[in-house]
């Protein structure tokens, strides 16, 4: 066996693993329509069942976290549409499906077609807001594309009659259900654009099942709505119903009645608006007239102010004011001159020599008196200070001490004798008494004993 052949030998585990990886990578998710059989739900909550047709079958599992989103409980024998991933259970080598979503086959196929067309048209830009046309306000004439015998037309006409009876309505009858309905709807839209009678179109019908509303999920209808030069309001079914026409239309209304309200004006509200505008116009007119009346009054007043008699009276009044001002000015000038003359006379009197001499004499006398008083006060102060100094000197003078019976003895050198150590026998001393001096000679020196000091008690 060659080396290349040996490297291609698989084990069972490797084979199953490789096949699983190939299935998951190459197939990915698929949509599958089939019949359910062998359905079971163990305590784990997962669903296990078989999907089959008349020629083959495949095992399938749907885990609990996924099957919670399913809106129905599958039954054996039920046709379903399943979106699933292909994988392989390696321990047994069985390939199986892991379901991601499930729905009954009828509605499921239609829903799948709806999603595919929606993605296609969205990719082409048919849903972009940049292509949406604004609705006219107000609409001059409304076109309605729907069944002539349906409840939708009755609802639209009833709302328009109630809200805006004067608004013209053109009906383009068409089938809204069945195989021929999409083409009829397309032709009605094209006819309305060809005639150009209306400035807005309502395209819709009443409620129904998904199959009943399927004409408005037709690609031809969607493209006709997109190509319309006239703005289109879609009004298909009830508020919960959503169709491709709703995405393409310039505006979606939840119901035909709501569409009629969107394209019409409320007559009661219109009357209220007109009344409000009339009231505002009346207020504006009243304000305008009041302003003009005030302007006229001001002009009349100005005209009266320009009358010759009034102008003459104003000039006379002005002349009297000027005359009074002139008289007052002359009187003030005279008073100022009089006061100035008086001041000059006073200065002249004060400038005469006799007056100055008299004033100087008075000032000299005053200064002499003040000087005498100052000298007297100063002399008294000196006397007091001298008396105090004498008293203080007398208190510390040695003569005062001698007068009290004491004497002062001096050594031959003239020093005061204070101790026996200063003199010797034969020295001559001079003693000062109160009334003179006495000279003496030392014949004997005696030293006094110091008194004994007592010891302190222990």
Swiss-Prot record:
Asked whether the UniProt record includes Cytoplasm among its keywords, one would answer yes
Signal peptide, first to last residue: none
Alphabetized UniProt keyword annotations: Cytoplasm, Exonuclease, Hydrolase, Nuclease
Q: Give any single GO term for biological process.
A: DNA catabolic process
According to the UniProt record, one GO cellular component term is: exodeoxyribonuclease VII complex
Q: Per its UniProt entry, what is the enzyme's top EC class, as one word?
A: hydrolase
Q: Where in the cell is it found?
A: Cytoplasm
Q: What's a Pfam family in this record?
A: Exonuc_VII_L
The EC number(s) given in the record are 3.1.11.6
Give the GO molecular function terms: exodeoxyribonuclease VII activity; nucleic acid binding
Give the protein's biological function.
Answer: Bidirectionally degrades single-stranded DNA into large acid-insoluble oligonucleotides, which are then degraded further into small acid-soluble oligonucleotides.
List the PANTHER family hit by this protein, alphabetically.
EXODEOXYRIBONUCLEASE 7 LARGE SUBUNIT (PTHR30008:SF0)
- Relate the assembly described in the record: Heterooligomer composed of large and small subunits.
Q: Which family does it belong to?
A: Belongs to the XseA family.
Question: Could you tell me which HAMAP family the record lists for this protein?
Answer: Exonuc_7_L (MF_00378)
> How is this protein named in the record?
Exodeoxyribonuclease 7 large subunit
């Amino acid at each position: 066996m060659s080396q290349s052949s040996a490297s291609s030998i698989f084990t069972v585990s490797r084979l199953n693993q490789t096949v699983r990886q190939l299935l998951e990578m190459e197939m990915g998710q698929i949509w599958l329509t089939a019949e359910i059989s062998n359905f079971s739900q163990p305590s784990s909550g997962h669903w296990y069942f078989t999907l089959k047709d008349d020629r083959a079958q495949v095992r399938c599992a749907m885990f609990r976290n996924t099957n919670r989103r399913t809106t129905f409980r599958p039954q054996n024998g039920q046709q379903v549409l399943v979106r699933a991933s292909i994988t392989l259970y390696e321990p047994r080598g069985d390939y199986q499906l892991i379901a991601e979503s499930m729905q009954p086959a009828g509605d499921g196929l239609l829903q799948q077609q709806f999603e595919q067309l929606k993605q296609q048209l969205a990719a082409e830009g048919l849903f972009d807001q940049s292509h949406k046309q604004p609705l006219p306000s107000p609409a001059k004439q409304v076109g309605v594309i729907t069944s002539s015998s349906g409840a939708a037309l009755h609802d639209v006409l009833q709302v328009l009659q109630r809200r805006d009876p004067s608004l013209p309505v053109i009906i383009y009858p068409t089938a809204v259900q069945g195989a021929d309905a999409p083409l009829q709807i397309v032709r009605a839209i094209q006819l309305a654009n060809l005639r150009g009678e209306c400035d807005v179109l309502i395209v819709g019908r009443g409620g129904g099942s998904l199959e009943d509303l399927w004409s408005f999920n037709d690609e031809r209808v969607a493209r006709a709505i997109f190509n319309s030069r006239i703005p289109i309001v879609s009004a298909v079914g009830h508020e919960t119903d959503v169709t491709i026409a709703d995405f393409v239309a310039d505006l979606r209304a939840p119901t035909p009645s709501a569409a009629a309200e969107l394209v019409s004006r409320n007559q009661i509200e219109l009357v209220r608006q007109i009344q409000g505008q009339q009231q505002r116009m009346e207020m504006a007119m009243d304000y305008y007239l009041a302003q003009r009346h005030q302007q006229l009054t001001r002009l009349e007043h100005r005209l009266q102010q320009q009358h010759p008699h009034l102008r003459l009276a104003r000039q006379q009044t002005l002349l009297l004011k000027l005359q009074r001002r002139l008289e007052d000015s002359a009187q003030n000038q005279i008073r100022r001159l009089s006061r100035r003359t008086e001041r000059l006379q006073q200065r002249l009197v004060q400038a005469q020599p006799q007056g100055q001499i008299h004033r100087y004499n008075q000032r000299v006398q005053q200064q002499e008196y003040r000087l005498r008083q100052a000298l007297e006060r100063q002399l008294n102060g000196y006397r007091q200070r001298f008396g105090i100094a004498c008293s203080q000197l007398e208190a510390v003078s040695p003569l005062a001490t001698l007068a009290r019976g004491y004497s002062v003895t001096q050594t031959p050198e003239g020093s005061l004798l204070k101790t026996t150590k200063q003199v010797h026998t034969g020295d001559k001393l001079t003693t000062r008494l109160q009334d003179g001096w006495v000279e003496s000679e030392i014949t004997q020196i005696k030293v006094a004993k110091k008194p004994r000091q007592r010891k302190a008690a222990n």
